Amino acid sequence: MAPASITTTTTVARRIVGSRRRTKATSPPDSPPPKKLKPISEILAKAQYAVVERADYGDVSCMQCGSGERAEELLLCDKCDKGFHMKCVRPIVVRVPIGSWLCPKCSGQRRVRRLSQRKIIDFFRIQKCNHKTDKCSSPQDIRKHRRRSGSLVYQKRRRRLLPFVSSEDPAQRLKQMGTLASALTELQMEFSDDLTYSSGMAPRSANQARFEEGGMQVLTKEDIETLEQCRAMCKRGDCPPLLVVFDSREGFTVEADGQIKDMTFIAEYTGDVDYIRNREHDDCDSMMTLLLAKDPSKSLVICPDKRGNIARFISGINNHTLDGKKKQNCKCVRYSVNGECRVFLVATRDIAKGERLYYDYNGYEHEYPTQHFV
């Protein structure tokens, strides 16, 4: 019996030891890593703001010029509650905003950053093209070499659209596209070379040139060929020789980066198509008339606030000064293309390299305030 009791005692001892090992307190866990605190400037930039309105704004003066005159042109920042004249702000504000407005300091405008080559190619969705094409020839040049048969008929010569001539240097074209991509990115816009019909806005079926009051001029077959040639060039990265340059007074502007001939197609005005009635209280300062219908409820506008192209950045002339018309070197024309309304920007004279592009914002309607334009 003795051996049995010894064995039992040993087994119990082993169980106790094992139990002690299992119930032994574990080592304290490592202290959590220190939390990274955001700087106060970043917190304030993202925090929602609330303006405590004063009872009387009669003593408000412009923070730039110090004058309290021209009260109808004084804007109040919805964040700092300070006043600024529309013409004193940089860039200049051309009309009183309908919604909220922030001064340049409170808006936290970011510095325009440069994009890499890969990002530029992806941004514009450039298609690779293996075969070399003639970028400078126009449909008119091709027809010069065709043999004509039949009787000769004399008729009035009509001016035709010319395709733009892109820069020969690929690095220069990349720079040009980079300036446009940076400007669109700064405004949180997508690139689009087409009219866009989004849900909740005007459908494509509403864009019919036959609704235009008084009719709309039809784009000829030859000019349609020029248009399609320019569109094909843009898709493969052969962009017009233009640079988007930021000006402290005018904001984003467009400059010629090469010689542009008279009657050259520059760009189509693109963006979201919507009814004018839906944009009566819209703060977008770049809306373009697309269709002026007999029935005002059917009139359409192009709204380049979410998507667009370089046409959105071309400046307007001042209709209230003698020098305004002298600056104009482009015109905005509306055409019927396959039954739909389209808007094009075309050079009205030869444009030299380094010259800024201007056209008349009030070419069709005198609705746009240009008295503060440079």
From Swiss-Prot:
Its main location: plastid. One of its GO terms (molecular function) is histone H3K27 monomethyltransferase activity. PROSITE patterns: SET, ZF_PHD_1, ZF_PHD_2. GO terms for cellular component: chloroplast; chromatin; nucleus. InterPro entries: ATXR5/ATXR6, SET_dom, SET_dom_sf, Zinc_finger_PHD-type_CS, Znf_FYVE_PHD, Znf_PHD, Znf_PHD-finger, Znf_RING/FYVE/PHD. It catalyses: L-lysyl(27)-[histone H3] + S-adenosyl-L-methionine = N(6)-methyl-L-lysyl(27)-[histone H3] + S-adenosyl-L-homocysteine + H(+). Residues 1-46 form a transit peptide. Residues 240-362 form the SET domain. S-adenosyl-L-methionine binds at residues 250-252, 312-316, 368, 374. Its EC number is 2.1.1.369. SMART domains: PHD, SET. Gene3D superfamilies: SET domain (2.170.270.10), Zinc/RING finger domain, C3HC4 (zinc finger) (3.30.40.10). Keywords: Chloroplast, Chromatin regulator, Metal-binding, Methyltransferase, Nucleus, Plastid, S-adenosyl-L-methionine, Transferase, Transit peptide, Zinc, Zinc-finger. It is an enzyme of class 2 (transferase). Substrate binds at residues 216, 334, 364-365. Disulfide bonds: none annotated. Belongs to the class V-like SAM-binding methyltransferase superfamily. This is Probable Histone-lysine N-methyltransferase ATXR5. The gene is ATXR5.
